Amino acid sequence: MASDNVSSQKSLGFVSVRHRLDQGYFGGYLLINSVARPLEFHCTVPVQPTRAQSILFGPTLEEFLCGEQICRALLSRAKLQPQVVLVDAPAALCVRHWIDLPILWVRARGAPGGAPGGTLGGTSSEQSSSGELLSPTSLEHGFQTPSHQRNASEYAERSSEHYQFCCLDSYRSDLDAIDWLNESYAIEHDLREPFERIIEALSEAHPRTKAA
């Protein structure tokens, strides 16, 4: 979807990538304006790696699926270009190699797990294998967060009052986008909420497979 007469509006992008064991990997991309209204939304069909891909990509498989295949496709479809794109899984950060936009992984400040690790807000005690807290919406719809993380030395990190942001160290200038977030509306909003919208939309587009 895309709204009319929005080309001059400053926008903020959110990409959520989730996984279901029986269906594969899903991605959704939501762009919002200064009052958090949707400007564009795009989502993917499930992406299920082949056995050959699982073997050949090894531990880099989730970066390939989440970043190169899913996030790259989503961001390339958009008509609008946001000031920054926030992602909810570190495996998505590698899309930065193909997209000339600041890409930041966001989580609540003080989340467990060091840099990276932790979560984007929330109070659920359920955790993924990466240590990230899964939102109630993710759990309700059977989604898991991709667990891949690089070595901590490959990330650059910066904190604001309520959030921690990570990017790939080779693109550490992306952290300058936090200044725009601080100076604009964005940091005053719950940065988790747009991800929840994406997950709800993904669950509508791709219902859970019913047990036989």
Describe the residue ranges of each PLM region.
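A glycine-rich, hydrophobic loop/mini-helix early in the fold
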Residues: Y25-Q81
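Gly/Ser/Thr-rich loops at beta-strand to alpha-helix junctions
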Residues: H19-D22, D88-C94, Y171
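Charge-biased, low-complexity intrinsically disordered regions
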Residues: H42-C43, Q53, L74, L104-V106, ...
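C-terminal folded domains that constitute the principal catalytic or ligand-binding module
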Residues: G131-A212
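Short Gly/Thr/Asp-enriched flexible loops that form oxyanion-binding sites at enzyme active sites
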Residues: A89-A108
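Structural motif
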Residues: Q83-V85
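Intrinsically disordered, low-complexity terminal tails and inter-domain linkers enriched
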Residues: G110-L139
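Two-metal-ion RNase H-like nuclease active-site motif
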Residues: A2-L21
